[in-house]
């Protein structure tokens, strides 16, 4: 029988999937009208009249980032805490720092906030760090089944694409890539978590 600590650790991938799925739904619904890399008065007007939902949505994104870091740490443990796995966790932590500081600024929104800059920080810096961390952990983990490996690499490659789209201030590119990432990523967390367990 597993210890309570073992059961808690085994839940990390599922918790990360739930948190990231909830954040993605928030982005597609309550956050979407306020989110734009070409931020304008219409976006600001939406945020001002939906401030509670806006703040709750970005709080979900902070929880998603923290759960992703927990998943990276859990995954690194499964990969044997090799040097590459340790580097991956450090890079993932840098991504969380970039994400949380950007999202905290979005939560504390006021009319003069440069929302586009906060979105770029999250979209470019955090996503690049997460994608590097994920790629390093893919390499550090031996024996992936072909389907899970292809699926996982697709997630991290799309993550790099999202960083490029955000750097280019492409709302359409960012929206399409974000949707593709989360459609793949949330179930991959569960499937990879089961295999790694």
Features from the language model and the residues they span:
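Hydrophobic, aromatic-enriched alpha-helical segments typical of multi-pass transmembrane helices
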Residues: 1-197
């Amino acid at each position: 029988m597993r210890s309570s600590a073992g059961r808690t650790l085994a839940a990390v991938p599922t918790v990360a999937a739930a948190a990231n799925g909830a954040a993605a739904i928030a982005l597609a619904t309550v956050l979407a009208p306020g989110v734009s890399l070409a931020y304008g008065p219409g976006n600001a007007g939406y945020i001002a009249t939906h401030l509670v939902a806006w703040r709750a949505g970005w709080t979900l994104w902070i929880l998603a980032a923290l759960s992703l870091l927990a998943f990276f740490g859990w995954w690194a443990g499964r990969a044997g805490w090799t040097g590459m796995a340790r580097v991956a966790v450090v890079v993932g932590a840098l991504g969380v720092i970039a994400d949380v500081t950007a999202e905290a600024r979005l939560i504390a929104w006021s009319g003069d906030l440069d929302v586009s800059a906060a979105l770029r920080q999250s979209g470019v810096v955090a996503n690049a760090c997460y994608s590097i961390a994920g790629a390093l952990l893919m390499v550090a983990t031996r024996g992936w089944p072909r389907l899970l490996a292809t699926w996982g690499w697709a997630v991290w490659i799309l993550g790099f694409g999202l960083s490029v789209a955000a750097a280019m201030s492409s709302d359409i590119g960012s929206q399409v890539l974000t949707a593709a990432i989360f459609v793949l990523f949330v179930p991959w967390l569960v499937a990879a978590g089961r295999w790694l367990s």
